[in-house]
Structure formats: C-alpha cells, structure tokens
C-alpha cells in the first residue's frame, strides 16, 4: 500500500509538472473545461487507491482555514466529517475556501472548489457537475460520504443563490 501511495504521489507530481493541475490557470477556464481536465487526470489512474491518494494530495495542497473561520456558521450540515466552507465575493466572482478533518473529504471539497471557485453565481448555478459520475466518485464513496458530497455541492450552490439574490436586490 505504501508503494501504491508513493506511485500516486509521483503521478500527482507529474500532473503538476505537465501544467494540468495549476490553480492559477483556472481563472481563465470555464467550469466545463476544468471538469474535462479533472476527468482526464482521474483517467490516468486505474486503481481507486491511486485515485484516493490523488484526492488526499489535492486536499493537502489547500491552504488551511484560520481557526477563526472554523465556526458553526461555516460548518456544512449533512456531512459525517466536519467540513467548513467559506465563500468570498470579488466583484461578480465567488471564491471558495474549505477545510475538513477527514483526508478524503478534504480532497473532495478541494476538487469541488477547484471546479467551481472563481466563477460567477450564475455560472455556478447553471453548472452540470458531470465530472462527479464520470470519474466514478459517487460509486466509490460510502453512502455517508456520498451524502456529504451532495451537501457540499448544495452549500456551494446556496452561496451562489444568496449572492445572486443580493446582486438582484441592489
């Protein structure tokens, strides 16, 4: 198992070197372009242990939230693990930050943020998150983690609804 994890980490390094997994380029990519890239990355791995390791590495690559933001208000309901989600608005653009106390869940929320952060509320609300079934994520999660994934997506979309309504009232 250690060898498998090492191989997955090496592949993540190769993915980053090829320029596929670069946070700074997502500002210019559409949600669908990012989803297609995620699908391509996950297709590089045949074994789900490697895919889990990729998720863990993605989660560990995220900046941790300050303790001051790990509040009940930022906690996502419906997740077995503790997941905090923060949304910042920059003009019309929504930027998400998150953290979890569970490694795989931290990776899942990092993946959602990668796809949805940096886009407008309308783009987020209109997004069909087809990458989730295409990479096989839901079928390889326990029912409780699958419910948590649904709750994370719901919370991100709720932020988009709230900011969209706020913009319409101004």
Go through each PLM region and give its residues:
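Hydrophobic residues embedded in beta-strands of well-ordered beta-sheets
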Residues: 92-94
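Alpha-helical support elements that line or immediately flank enzyme active sites
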Residues: 109-119
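Glycine-rich phosphate/pyrophosphate-binding loops
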Residues: 118-135
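N-terminal intrinsically disordered, cationic/polar leader segments
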Residues: 31-39, 43-82, 89-90, 132-151, ...
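A short interface-forming secondary-structure element
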Residues: 100-101
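Short, Lys/Arg-enriched N-terminal segments with co-localized hydrophobic residues
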Residues: 17-28
